[in-house]
Amino acid sequence: MSLLCVGVKKAKFDGAQEKFNTYVTLKVQNVKSTTIAVRGSQPSWEQDFMFEINRLDLGLTVEVWNKGLIWDTMVGTVWIPLRTIRQSNEEGPGEWLTLDSQVIMADSEICGTKDPTFHRILLDTRFELPLDIPEEEARYWAKKLEQLNAMRDQDEYSFQDEQDKPLPVPSNQCCNWNYFGWGEQHNDDPDSAVDDRDSDYRSETSNSIPPPYYTTSQPNASVHQYSVRPPPLGSRESYSDSMHSYEEFSEPQALSPTGSSRYASSGELSQGSSQLSEDFDPDEHSLQGSDMEDERDRDSYHSCHSSVSYHKDSPRWDQDEEELEEDLEDFLEEEELPEDEEELEEEEEEVPDDLGSYAQREDVAVAEPKDFKRISLPPAAPGKEDKAPVAPTEAPDMAKVAPKPATPDKVPAAEQIPEAEPPKDEESFRPREDEEGQEGQDSMSRAKANWLRAFNKVRMQLQEARGEGEMSKSLWFKGGPGGGLIIIDSMPDIRKRKPIPLVSDLAMSLVQSRKAGITSALASSTLNNEELKNHVYKKTLQALIYPISCTTPHNFEVWTATTPTYCYECEGLLWGIARQGMRCTECGVKCHEKCQDLLNADCLQRAAEKSSKHGAEDRTQNIIMVLKDRMKIRERNKPEIFELIQEIFAVTKTAHTQQMKAVKQSVLDGTSKWSAKISITVVCAQGLQAKDKTGSSDPYVTVQVGKTKKRTKTIYGNLNPVWEENFHFECHNSSDRIKVRVWDEDDDIKSRVKQRFKRESDDFLGQTIIEVRTLSGEMDVWYNLDKRTDKSAVSGAIRLHISVEIKGEEKVAPYHVQYTCLHENLFHFVTDVQNNGVVKIPDAKGDDAWKVYYDETAQEIVDEFAMRYGVESIYQAMTHFACLSSKYMCPGVPAVMSTLLANINAYYAHTTASTNVSASDRFAASNFGKERFVKLLDQLHNSLRIDLSMYRNNFPASSPERLQDLKSTVDLLTSITFFRMKVQELQSPPRASQVVKDCVKACLNSTYEYIFNNCHELYSREYQTDPAKKGEVLPEEQGPSIKNLDFWSKLITLIVSIIEEDKNSYTPCLNQFPQELNVGKISAEVMWNLFAQDMKYAMEEHDKHRLCKSADYMNLHFKVKWLYNEYVTELPAFKDRVPEYPAWFEPFVIQWLDENEEVSRDFLHGALERDKKDGFQQTSEHALFSCSVVDVFSQLNQSFEIIKKLECPDPQIVGHYMRRFAKTISNVLLQYADIISKDFASYCSKEKEKVPCILMNNTQQLRVQLEKMFEAMGGKELDAEASDILKELQVKLNNVLDELSRVFATSFQPHIEECVKQMGDILSQVKGTGNVPASACSSVAQDADNVLQPIMDLLDSNLTLFAKICEKTVLKRVLKELWKLVMNTMEKTIVLPPLTDQTMIGNLLRKHGKGLEKGRVKLPSHSDGTQMIFNAAKELGQLSKLKDHMVREEAKSLTPKQCAVVELALDTIKQYFHAGGVGLKKTFLEKSPDLQSLRYALSLYTQATDLLIKTFVQTQSAQGLGVEDPVGEVSVHVELFTHPGTGEHKVTVKVVAANDLKWQTSGIFRPFIEVNIIGPQLSDKKRKFATKSKNNSWAPKYNESFQFTLSADAGPECYELQVCVKDYCFAREDRTVGLAVLQLRELAQRGSAACWLPLGRRIHMDDTGLTVLRILSQRSNDEVAKEFVKLKSDTRSAEEGGAAPAP
C-alpha cells in the first residue's frame, strides 16, 4: 500500500472574476475528497490530501466545480495515471496542468481526458517513500541520496553570486516559509478561506516518537537541528517531504501562505516534533526512550510525521541561500532587535556548556553532530515571539565544538525525565560511519558559515538602522521577570518523545518514601519543569482573564437573504423567499433556525475575527473596546484569582503585571490570529442502524471542519465497520466545530435522482459534533452518535483519533498536559506551601461534590482552564486523584480518593444504553493515558498494601480520625479492585478482602515479632507500675529462658492486648467485608499460630531440663488455656480441631500428678493421725463418718478440680491424665483402707462398738465419694483404663468393707454361741414327739419365744445401737454377718451338734458343711471333710465305740416338735432381722444359704431312713470317682433286669477278679470281696454278699455271682452297689483294703455292664451326704441306718509292715 499526497494549490481560470466560486474534487479508487470553495478567477486553495493506494494501475481524477444556486457545474477535469506520479518524501512546488472538458472511459473506468480548456490548475502530486523499510536499508538509501546531493555541491558557496536566486524550500506543515515573509504572497481573493498574514503556523505536533534518523525542522523552535543526513525512507505514516524536480524551482513560485495542510495526525509528532539529529546513536543513549516508547512508536498506527530537513548538501542550498537572506532581511525589518551586539553576546553566554537542560528530557531532541551549533530562525508574528536563543557570531572550528543547545532563561519545555542523563563525552554524538561524519563536517561547516554570515550581516544592519529600540519587544530579549512570551500560543519545540509522566511514571521511589504517600515526584512531575510552568502560567491567565463562562452568546434575529445564502453551520441553502434563516447582529453569522443552537462560540471574538479579516477596523475597535472592558472588570472583580495564579507559579509582581498586559493583548488578537491543523483518523464504528432492506447498511463517514468536508470509503454490508482513514484539515476559527457524520450509501436510481436535487441523498446514520477549541495534542476517543432531529433513527458509536496543532503551540504540551501542570502546581502550592504538607479538603456537598478539588478560588482556576481548553471533568478527576496519591496518608485523603476513584469507575464502567463500547475501550481512549493510570493504581495499590501491612503504626487505634482513614483506605482498595475488574476487565484481580486480609496478617506477623523481641520492655512500660521492679531483669534474661516462665506470661498479656485492640478498635472500623474479614478473629488466629509455634519449641526445651516447678508449668498451662478458650476456640479454623497446646504441657501435668500423689499420701497420714487422736469422732451430728475421709477427699477433689479446670480439649491427653489420677486415687484410698484394716480388730476387741462402726462408715464413705469422683471424672465416658482402675478399686473397697463387717461380726461370736447354747438347753426341755397338732400351735409359739429369749436380748441391745451409728449400707453388711453367724451357730449347736466336744466334727461341719443349697454336689476336694469324720471316729478307738457314742448322744437328736419350735423361732429371727424394711430384705433372708442349710438340716430330721438313703444315693454321684491313688481294682459284671409284670428289679453281680491290690500285712493276706446294695425299701431283703477269700493273692480271681432283689416302688437310679475288698482275719474284725461304688443309674439305659472299678481309700461325700450321715448316725435304733452309717464311714484300715505283694 502506498500513500498518495496531493496538494491542490491554485488555479487560473479564463473568465470574469465574479463568475467563479470553485472547489476541487479528487477521486481515486472509491475515495472522494473535496476542497473548500474559493471565489475568483485565480483561486488559491492550498489544501493537501492523502490517499491510501493499493492499485497503481488506476488514476487520480481531478475535477474543478463551480458552485451554483441549485446545482454545480464542472469547470474542467484532469486524469493523472498513478504510475506517472513521482516518489518523494518532500513537497514540491507543483505542476501546472490544463483542464480538459471530457473524460475517456474504458470498461466503465476513466482512462484519460480530452478536449482541453483554457483553465489551468497547479497540483503537487507525489507518493511517500516506501513504508516500514528496515532501518539498515533506510540508512543505506539515506546515504546514497546524500552522496548524490553532495555531487552537486562541489563549488564553494559565493554569497555575492547567488543574490537573486530564490530559496527552494518546500512548504509543509512543519514550516510554512511564507509565514515568515519568505515567500511571495499571491493570494488575491480576499474571501479565500485561507489568510495570508495572521497565521502563525510553525510545525506539526504529534504524540508518538518519530522513527530514528528522522529530523524535523522547526523555524520557531528554540533549538534547531540541521541534519547531517537525509531523512530516512519513511515510517509508516511519516509524511516527510523531500525535494524533487529541483529544476522546477528555477522560477520561484510564491508558496501559499497556509502552506500544506498535509500534516501529521495526532499520533506522531505532538510529543516528538523535535528529534535527535541523525548522528545521535539511538542504541547508545537513553534519549531514544525505553522499549515502551518503541512500543508506542509501533502503536501510532494512524499517525504521521511532517518535517522538512535542511540538508547540508541539498542540491540548491548554495544557490538559494541568498534569497533566504533577503527574505530574512525583509522580515527582520519589521522586528525590534537588540541595540547592539553586546546583548547578543550576553545572550550567547547563557548557552550552557553541556546538554543538561535538554538532554535530560526525552521530549527535547538536542543531539547534533559535533560540527554544529544551534541557530534559531526568527518567527513571523511581530511582537509575539518566544524567547529564542541567538546564533553564535562566528563559526568556530567545527571539529572541536561540542553540541550546545541554546538555552535562554526560561525556555518553556515539557517536564524533565530523570531517567535520561546527559552524554558523558562527545563520542555519543558522532556519526556511526566515519565517512559520513567527515562529509558532514566539510559540507556542514560551509553551510553553517554561510548562514551565520548572512544572518549576522542582516542583524548588524538592523541594529544600525534602529538604534536603541524598545527592548521590551526585543526579538532577542534578556532573561528575567519581564522576558515572558508575548504570544502565549507560540512555544519552542519542547515536545516529548514519550507521554509525559504526569503522575505515575516516576513512582519507583515508592517504597523509600512510603510514609508520605507515593513519592512527591510521582504526583508532581511538572513542578520542576520551569518552561512548561511558564507557558501554563500564561495560558491560565488567558483562560481566566476572559473565561468561557463569560463569553457572549450570539444575538440572532430572523433575517431575509436577498441573494442565495448558505447556512454557516450545515452549509445548506437558506431556502425561501424571505425570512429564510437567522443572522447574528453582532458578528453577522447566518444559519438555519434549526442550526442556531449549534453555533455557541463567543460572538465577540467571532466578530473581531471577521472584522479584522474584512478590514472593518472601526467595528473591530468597538468590539475590542468591549473585550477590554470586560477583561478590566474581570481583573477588578476577581483579583484573588490572579494573585493566586501569580503565587502558584512564583512569578514576580513586575513580570506578572507585564504578562497580564500581554495576555489581554492576545485575547484581543483572539481568533483573528488563531489557526490550527487538525488530523482526524476515522478508526471504526459499532452498533450502527440498519437502513437497507437486507438488514444492514453501507456506511461511510464525512468529516467536516469549517467549510472543508472529506469522506471515507464505503464499507459494504457492515454495521460495525472499520475504516482506519486519516484526514487533515486547517482551521482558522477556534469556534469552529468538527462535524463527523455517518451515512448509509445508496447507489440506486432513486438515490441518483435525489442527488441532483438534494444535498443529502444518502441515509443519515448519526453524527457527533466536537468543539475545535477544546482540542489540543491528540485523543483517541469513542463518541456516541447523536440525532440531528427527533425523527432520526440513530444508534452506536464512532471511534476517532484526533490530533491538533494550534499555530504557535506546535511545540508545546497538549492542553491536557498543561492542565496537569496547572493542577499539580496548584495542589503543591495549596498543600505544601500554604498548608505545610497537609491536604486541605474542601467542604462540598451534593452529587457533584467529588468534582470540587479546592477552595472556591483555586477551583475556579482549574474549572475555567478545563472549560476553555476542553479538558474533560474525568481527566480533572484522574489528575486530582494522581495528586492525592502523593499524599494518600494524610488525614481525610483516603476517603476523598476512594470517592474520586468510585466516580472514575462509574464513568468508565457504567456505559450508556446507546453504545456498545466496552468500559475497557472507553478507558483505553482516556486522555489521561491508560498505562499511566493503571501504573498509578498499581503503585498506589502496592503502597496501600504496604501501609495496611503496618496498620497498627500508620492508623493507631487511639486516633478515631486515623481509624476513619483506615476504613477509607480499604474502601480505596475496593475501588481499585472494582476498577481492575470492571474497567480494565481483568479476569480475576486480587479481591480487596483478600488483600486486606493478607495485609492484616502481615501486620500481625510483624507485630508478634515485635512484641516477642521487646516483650519485657513493653510489659514493663504498659503493665508494671512499680518502677523498682522494672530494672530487675537483666537484658540477657529478658527473653525466653529455661530457668523461668515469666517471659511467656508477659507475652500472653501483650498478645491479649493486641487481640483486644484489633477486636474492639479495628474490627468495627474494617467492617466492609463482614463475611470474609474479621480483624479480631484474624488477629487471634495469627497471634495464636505464631505463639503456638514458639511455645511448642519452648516447652520441648523445658521438658529436657525441668528447671521450673511443676506448679509454674501448671499456672502457665492455665494462662495458655484461657488464651485459647477466650480467643481461639471459636475461630472457624479451630472449631473442629483438637488444639495442640495440651500436648505441650502433658509431661508437666503428669509430673504434677506424680508430685500430687505424694502430697496426697502425706496428707492422708496426717489426716488419719489427727482422726485417731480425736478418737474418730463424727464430723457432724448427721454425718456418721469421721473427718479423715473428708480430708482425704478434699485433697483429691482439689487435685481433680485443677485437672478439670485445665479443660483439656484433647480426649487422648485427658485419658492420660485420668489414668494417672485414677492411680493416685487408688493408691491413696487403698492405703487408707489398709491402715484401717490393720488396726480394726483391735478396736473391735475393746468392746467399743462405736469406733469400729465409724471406721466401717469411713470405708463406706470412701466408696460413696469414689463413686462421685468416678462420675465427676466422666462416668461412662471416662477413659477405659482409668475406669477399670476405679472399678477395681471399688471392688477392693467393697471387699475391705465386707472383711471389716465380718471381723466386726465375728467379735460378737462368743456372745452369740453362749446365747445359742442357752437356746439349745431351753429347746431340749421342750417335750413331745411326733407331729404337732394344730391345737398345740400356741404352746409351740410360746416355746419358740422362750427358746429365742437369750439371743433376742443380745441382738436387741446391739442392733439398736448399730442402727444409730452405722451407715445404712454398713448396717446391712453387719446384719448380714450377724445373720450368718446366728444361723450357722444355731445349725452347729442345736440342729447338727458335733458328735462330741472332743471331736473335730464340729469344726469340720463349720468349715465344710454350710452355705450350700440342698442337693448341691461338692467337688472331690471336699473329701477332706469326710476324712476328718473318719479320723475323729478313729480317735474313739473301735467303730463299735462310735456306735456307743451315737447312743450317748441320742438326747441331742431333735424331735419333730422341737423342729417345729426351731422353725417358728427361725421365722421370728427372720422378722427381727427384716425389722419392717429397715434391716435386711426379705428376699435376701429367704434365699440366704445359711437359712436354707439350717432348714434343710431340720427337714432331714423329719424324713424316714429310706428317704434319707435315697437322697444320699441320688445326690452323691461322685463317691467312687476321682481316685487319685487307687489301691487296686475290681472287675465286675453287672446285669439289671426288670420284671415286665411286677416291675420288680433284679441285679445280678458277677465278681470276676481283683487286680493290683496294694496291701501290706505281716500275716497271710486273704482278700475277699464284699458287695452291698444300698437304697430304699431294702429292710426286708438281703443287702450284702461276700466272695470266698483267696490266700496271699494280690490279684485274686473269684468269678462268683450274686443276685439282689430291688423294690418295684423305686427305680434303679435310687440304688447303688458298694464293693469293698477286705482282708479276712480270724478272731478279729476284717480289715478294709479299698472301696468302690457303682451307681445303678448308669445301667438303667444299657441293662448290663462289665467294668473295672478302681478301689479308693474311702467314700467321697459332699455336705449333703455328711448331713444325711450325721442324721442317720443319730438313729441308733434303726438297723438300716446303722448299717448305712457303717458302710459310708468305712475307710481303708492301717497297714501292717511286712510281706511284699505277690507277683
Curated annotation (Swiss-Prot):
A single Gene Ontology CC annotation of this entry is: synaptic vesicle membrane
Stretches of Basic and acidic residues bias are at 186-203, 360-374, 421-433
**MHD2 domain sequence ranges:** 1345-1512
**Residues noted as binding Ca(2+) 1 in the record, renumbered to the chain:** D692, D698, D744, D746
Q: Where is the composition biased (Acidic residues)?
A: 319-353
* Gene Ontology molecular function: any one: syntaxin-1 binding
Key words, A-Z: Calcium, Cell membrane, Cell projection, Coiled coil, Cytoplasm, Differentiation, Exocytosis, Membrane, Metal-binding, Phosphoprotein, Repeat, Synapse, Zinc, Zinc-finger
Q: Which stretches does the entry tag as region Disordered? A: 186-445
The UniProt record gives the binding positions of Zn(2+) 2 as C584, C587, C603
Tissue specificity is: Expressed in pancreatic islet cells. Expressed in melanocytes.
Q: Which cofactor does it need?
A: Ca(2+)
Q: Where does Ca(2+) 2 bind?
A: D692, D744, D746, D763
Please name the PROSITE patterns in this protein's record: C2 (PS50004), MHD1 (PS51258), MHD2 (PS51259), ZF_DAG_PE_1 (PS00479), ZF_DAG_PE_2 (PS50081)
**Residues recorded with modification Phosphoserine:** S240, S242, S245, S256
Entry keyword Transport: no
Compositional bias (Low complexity) at which positions?
265-277
Phorbol-ester/DAG-type zinc finger span: 553-603
Reading the lineage from the top rank, the first entry is: Eukaryota
GO term, biological process aspect, one:
cell differentiation
Q: How does it sit in the membrane?
A: Peripheral membrane protein
Self-association state and partner proteins as the record states: Interacts with the N-termini of STX1A and/or STX1B1 and DOC2A. Interacts with BSN. Interacts with RIMS1 which recruits UNC13A to the active zone. Forms homodimers via its first C2 domain. Also interacts via this domain with the zinc finger domain of RIMS2. Part of a complex consisting of ERC2, RIMS1 and UNC13A. Also part of a complex consisting of UNC13A, RIMS2 and RAB3A. Interacts with FBXO45 (via SRY domain); leading to the degradation of UNC13A by the proteasome.
Q: What does this protein do?
A: Plays a role in vesicle maturation during exocytosis as a target of the diacylglycerol second messenger pathway. Involved in neurotransmitter release by acting in synaptic vesicle priming prior to vesicle fusion and participates in the activity-dependent refilling of readily releasable vesicle pool (RRP). Essential for synaptic vesicle maturation in most excitatory/glutamatergic but not inhibitory/GABA-mediated synapses. Facilitates neuronal dense core vesicles fusion as well as controls the location and efficiency of their synaptic release.
Q: Domain annotation text?
A: The C2 domains are not involved in calcium-dependent phospholipid binding.
Task: Give the UniProt family note.
Answer: Belongs to the unc-13 family.
**Under what name is this protein listed?**
Protein unc-13 homolog A
> What gene is behind this protein?
UNC13A
